[in-house]
Amino acid sequence: DRRQRQMCIRDSIRTSGFDEMLDKQSMQIFYEDVLREVDVYNNDITLLQTRFVSPLSRIAPEFYKFYLTDTVYVDTTRCVELTFVPRNASTMGFTGRFYVPVGDSTMFIKRITMRVPHDINLNFIEGLSITQDYVKAPDGSRLKMVDDMTLEARLMPGTPGIYGRRHTVYDGHNFDPAPDPEIFSKGGDQIKAVGAEYRGQKF
């Protein structure tokens, strides 16, 4: 049903640093496999061919321990802070926190922050963290506004470390029927706008 399909248009893409160290093909693999977009609402999250149980999956209560740790403001919204850690430290899970507006009976998550524990072996990745922000649409559905992933890596022992970041901002959400339904026949859920790689830093 095309009315339920989603499409993201990438208006601006900017890279700095990595493109000076890796060739174009290696860069593509790096972004698709390491700095890939993560859907925290999936039961499993795959990073570097390693499957992690999402803290928001159906089996999360069996896999994670949850603690009510604080009440804080996220932007201007007063939220309850819930901390989660794997029940078994040796399993593939995240540590982190999510924030739910005080009094929200739907348990809508406004922000989630999570990281891969340092004692988990992820090949050359020494540290990886994810932060995502959401707002509630008028119909109650969730809209992702910010997706921020940072990592620390060391490609070979004894070499300098690498710091990488993928910061994505979403806006202009539009629920009107697509003016050209054929846009959904192109495959995938993202379209790169013409000239996206050449936008200025102030775009």
List the predicted regions and their residue ranges:
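Short, small-residue-biased leader/transition segments that mark boundaries at the very start
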Residues: 2-9
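Low-complexity, polar-biased intrinsically disordered regions enriched in Pro/Ser/Thr/Gly
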Residues: 3, 155-160, 186, 191-193
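Long, low-complexity, polar/charged, intrinsically disordered or flexibly structured peripheral segments
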Residues: 10-48
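Short acidic/polar alpha-helix capping motifs at helix-coil junctions
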Residues: 29-33, 61-65, 95-98
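Edge strands and adjacent loops of beta-rich recognition modules
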Residues: 39-73
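Gly/Pro-enriched, hydrophobic low-complexity segments
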Residues: 53-55, 67-68, 73, 77-183
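Interface/linker segment at the passenger-translocator junction
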Residues: 181-203
